[in-house]
Every structure is written in structure tokens, then in C-alpha cells.
From Swiss-Prot:
Keyword Membrane: no
Glycosylation: residue positions: N122
GO molecular function, one term: phospholipase A2 inhibitor activity
Family: Belongs to the alpha-type phospholipase A2 inhibitor family.
Annotated function: This phospholipase A2 inhibitor binds directly phospholipase A2 in the presence or absence of calcium.
Record key words, sorted: Calcium, Disulfide bond, Glycoprotein, Lectin, Phospholipase A2 inhibitor, Secreted, Signal
Tissue spec: Expressed by the liver.
Protein name, per record: Phospholipase A2 inhibitor clone 05
Disulfide bond residue pairs: C83-C160, C138-C152
Annotated signal peptide: 1-19
Length: 166
């Protein structure tokens, strides 16, 4: 939005710097003002539509985070790159409802996927006997949402996490 306003001011500055009789009737200025107001309304409409879709997508899971798969099967490093390119994150459920939303994706596809567990995690969902460093340094979730130690070379379902701070 700021970019639009700055662009409008730049255009006005170009007109003013021309040296000729500039906009004696105020038509250019009024046109710019109208254009900015129109863009502000469009932006508000798009923001509202986006929030509606986001709320609808997250309604069923009770989570404000979205877990989305591209259905590819990749190792941890490839997952990291894919999620980064998509401007998402490797899943890192911080609450039970987030883990459930993540597990729902895995259950629908009948596959396991990687996740990241932070050092200061208040929520964990380790399966019995886990974590087991002998199994690997990465973490995967099964179709029930239970966490297991895993090799980072395993090829698992690609799932990225997206969350919105508004």
C-alpha cells in the first residue's frame, strides 16, 4: 500500500517538475487521489477475501496454521528447500490442535512426514520409546501424529507449514 502511495507522489512530482502550467484545474491530482482510494478499497476487499479463505481452511482443524502437501516424497534437505521456496516452513506443531491438523494431512495421504521440534517446545507428542537418537537425528510424524526419530535421508511426504500473522 505504501508503494502505491509513493508511486502516486512520484507521478505528481514528475508533473510538478515539468515547469509548465501544472494541473490548473486539479484534474491530475484528483485523478491520483481517486486512483489511490480505489486501490485502497481493492486492497481491503482482497484482504477480506484472503482472511475468509484462511479462516475456512483452518476452521476444521482448529489451527491457525495450514499444513499443505505437494504429494512429493523427498528427504529432509529437499523438504527444507521446497518449503523455503514456497515461503513456508517445515512443520513445527506447537500445540495439540496444530499437531492434529498436521496429522490429518498425513492420515489422508497414508504417509509419514518430517517435522521440527524446537528445544523449548512446550508441546511434544513422542511415541513410546522415543526420541531414539540411534534411529536418526531428524523427527517424523506418523499418520496418527505420533513423533519418531528418523534418518534425515528417509524419503517422506513433503508437507510445509504456513501461518499468518495479521
Amino acid at each position: 500500500m505504501r508503494l502505491i502511495l509513493l508511486s502516486s507522489l512520484l507521478l505528481l512530482g514528475i508533473f510538478l517538475a515539468d515547469g509548465d502550467e501544472v494541473d490548473p484545474d486539479g484534474k491530475v491530482l484528483n485523478s491520483l487521489i481517486y486512483g489511490v482510494m480505489h486501490l485502497q478499497r481493492e486492497f481491503a476487499n482482497l484482504k477480506g477475501a484472503f482472511l475468509t479463505v484462511h479462516r475456512a481452511r483452518s476452521f476444521g482443524s482448529g489451527s491457525e496454521r495450514l499444513y499443505v502437501t505437494n504429494k512429493e516424497i523427498k528427504n529432509f534437505e529437499a523438504l527444507r528447500q521446497i518449503c523455503e521456496q514456497a515461503e513456508g516452513h517445515i512443520p513445527s506443531p506447537q500445540l495439540e490442535n496444530q499437531n492434529k491438523a498436521f496429522a490429518n494431512v498425513l492420515e489422508r495421504h497414508g504417509k509419514e512426514a518430517y517435522l521440527v521440534v524446537g528445544d523449548s517446545a512446550n508441546f511434544t507428542n513422542w511415541a513410546a520409546g522415543e526420541p531414539n537418537k540411534a534411529a536418526g537425528t531428524c523427527v517424523k510424524a506418523d499418520t496418527h501424529g505420533s513423533w519418531h526419530s528418523a534418518s534425515c535421508d528417509d524419503n517422506l511426504l513433503v508437507v510445509c507449514e504456513f501461518y499468518f500473522i495479521l
